[in-house]
């Protein structure tokens, strides 16, 4: 049976941002809002978490496994010798302060660290604690969110001027017709960011050519955000805090579609110090759960990443790809020969595998698909690739 032409004619929307799968999400916020504590509990590491601004100077970076019941289930079924989940690369960036775009605090260095990331965990503080100073003198997460947004916005505005000046010199005054379209696009970006004071990512109708230009410059306001609200343990457990509704309203108005996830750094730290059995008892007694799995998954999705599985008795592995990746390019993640000699992808949906109970049962039910080179891989696909081995050049 020839492979089906799954995905023919379906073109995924272009993505603003760096191309690739080794993408990073940075933890961004004002000093002393709980960034390093969050990084530590997320990664089980011991980054400095002292109570003073700029205790994090060089960014700390770590890989965090992405929790997935599908992966766990496949491992339980196959009992493989090797288990490799997907990972999220997380960076702890020092606290920004008002005036960072002008070099206040360690502003320029911090903004360059954000520039090196592909998405942002925007962490804000909504807990009171007299022992933990706030750089602005009081707890007001809306004000804090606006400070961060303004600093990123002002840095982009600062970047746009010289880019347009350079293009104008070559494309307009110099008559370089090839660069004229890029100049026109940057004028549109200027109108949106500088004149209308809106982040790059808020405009949802950038076309392919415009996104190509945006991706040359990687503006800070083009990066997707997940808003993390750090609560006291008490507020998190009772699911009440005076700021939560206000934060959600602000995000819905100024960053529509972005997620707002409450968590408690204090609770997560406490859970980390308990044994697995004690942790389970504590969570059940308080009728709550850790927010970390939800946060990790949200960060991974914000970077437009997903993964497919290869599964067998030797190895169960999650292979990270960008959304919209076609089967040959997904095969190339395993080995370049798989892409070069691609014949077809034999695909099972995880849900079908779970429902039927085995690969043979999936085949018997007619749910095992052969897909061609235009098939767009979907998150959670279980795939076996068929390919021709490239011919080795004959020795003379």
From Swiss-Prot:
GO MF, any single term: metal ion binding
Protein name: Obg-like ATPase 1
A Pfam family matched in the record: MMR_HSR1
Keyword Transferase: no
Compartment list: Cytoplasm; Nucleus; Nucleus, Nucleolus
Source species: Pongo abelii
Family: Belongs to the TRAFAC class OBG-HflX-like GTPase superfamily. OBG GTPase family. YchF/OLA1 subfamily.
Positions with a binding annotation for ATP: 32-37, 231
Predominant localisation class: cytoplasm
């Amino acid at each position: 049976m020839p492979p089906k032409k799954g995905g023919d004619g379906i073109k995924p929307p272009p993505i603003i941002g760096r191309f690739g799968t080794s993408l990073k999400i940075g933890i961004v916020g004002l000093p002393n809002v709980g960034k390093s504590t969050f990084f530590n509990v997320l990664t089980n590491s011991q980054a400095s978490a002292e109570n003073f601004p700029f205790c994090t100077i060089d960014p700390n970076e770590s890989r965090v496994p992405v929790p997935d019941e599908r992966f766990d289930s496949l491992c339980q079924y196959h009992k493989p010798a090797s288990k490799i989940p997907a990972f999220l690369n997380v960076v702890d960036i020092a606290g920004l302060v008002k005036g960072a775009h002008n070099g206040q605090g360690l502003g320029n260095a911090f903004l360059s660290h954000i520039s090196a990331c592909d998405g942002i965990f925007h962490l804000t503080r909504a807990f009171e604690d007299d022992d933990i100073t706030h750089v602005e003198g009081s707890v007001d997460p809306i004000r804090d969110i606006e400070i961060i947004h303004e600093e990123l916005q002002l840095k982009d505005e600062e970047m746009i001027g010289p880019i347009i000046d350079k293009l104008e010199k070559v494309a307009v005054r110099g008559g370089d017709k090839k660069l004229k379209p890029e100049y026109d696009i940057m004028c549109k970006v200027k109108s949106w960011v500088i004149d209308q004071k809106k982040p790059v990512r808020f405009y949802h109708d950038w076309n392919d050519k415009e996104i190509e230009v945006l991706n040359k410059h990687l503006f800070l306001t083009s990066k997707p955000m997940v808003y993390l609200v750090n609560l006291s343990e008490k507020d998190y457990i009772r699911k009440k805090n005076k700021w939560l509704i206000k934060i959600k309203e602000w995000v819905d108005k100024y960053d529509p579609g972005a997620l707002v996830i409450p968590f408690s750094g204090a609770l997560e730290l406490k859970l980390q110090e308990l044994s697995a059995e004690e942790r389970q008892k504590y969570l059940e007694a308080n009728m709550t759960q850790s927010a970390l799995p939800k946060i990790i998954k949200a960060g991974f999705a914000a970077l437009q990443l997903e993964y497919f599985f290869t599964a067998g008795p030797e190895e169960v592995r999650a292979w990270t790809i960008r959304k919209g990746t076609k089967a040959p390019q997904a095969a190339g993640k395993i080995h370049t020969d798989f892409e070069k000699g691609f014949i077809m992808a034999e695909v099972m949906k995880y849900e079908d595998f779970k429902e039927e109970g085995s690969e043979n049962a999936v085949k018997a039910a007619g749910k095992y698909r052969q897909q061609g080179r235009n098939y767009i891989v979907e998150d959670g696909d279980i795939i076996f690739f068929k390919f021709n081995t490239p011919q080795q050049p004959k020795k003379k």
